[in-house]
């Protein structure tokens, strides 16, 4: 009986946390879509908000990728780190990215890194998802280079969200 009551209590807490996460995600997505600098006409979608919650940026990147069928990265403020020499603290942005089948996200980030070694602090991932940290003052450079990288790997292809549906279609449902 006591274990059951505890389980119910934990389930309620988890449900509250999940509802809160969904609200944060919705707000962040709406903010990202209303940003004047969000580019959905190019081959990428990159967004950053000072109030974005680091724990939800991956989900928002996934939603943007689904909406625009473009590799998408969302950034949030990262914890400021002290430099070893005691000078001014470094300001960083943490990002989470999601991609589409035609673009290998980690390779695109590697392209950015090779073009300018001073943009990203670190990055990692695979073809469809990646995490990265960039210097905050290099955000615009990152956006430009990421667009260049994805355009390079797209090789002139236009991204189209084609849905493949595997099902039987009865002959009497077809008309000419």
Regions found by a protein language model. Give the residues of each.
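Hydrophobic helix-and-loop "lid/oligomerization" segment in the mid-to-C-terminal part
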Residues: 1-141, 148, 152, 159-174
């Amino acid at each position: 009986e006591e274990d059951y009551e505890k389980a119910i209590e934990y389930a309620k807490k988890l449900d509250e946390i999940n509802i809160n996460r969904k609200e944060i995600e919705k707000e962040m997505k709406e903010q990202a879509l209303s940003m004047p600098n969000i580019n959905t006409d190019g081959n990428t979608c990159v967004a950053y908000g000072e109030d974005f919650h680091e724990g939800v940026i991956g989900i928002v990147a996934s939603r943007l990728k689904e909406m625009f069928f473009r590799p998408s990265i969302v950034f949030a403020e990262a914890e400021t780190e002290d430099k070893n020499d005691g000078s001014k603290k470094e300001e960083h942005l943490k990002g989470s990215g999601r991609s589409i089948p035609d673009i290998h996200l980690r390779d695109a980030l590697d392209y950015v890194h090779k073009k300018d070694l001073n943009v990203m602090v670190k990055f990692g991932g695979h073809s469809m998802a990646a995490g990265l940290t960039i210097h905050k003052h290099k955000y615009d450079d990152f956006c430009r280079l990421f667009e260049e990288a994805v355009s390079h790997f797209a090789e002139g292809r236009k991204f189209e969200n084609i849905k493949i549906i595997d099902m039987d279609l009865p002959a009497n449902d077809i008309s000419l």
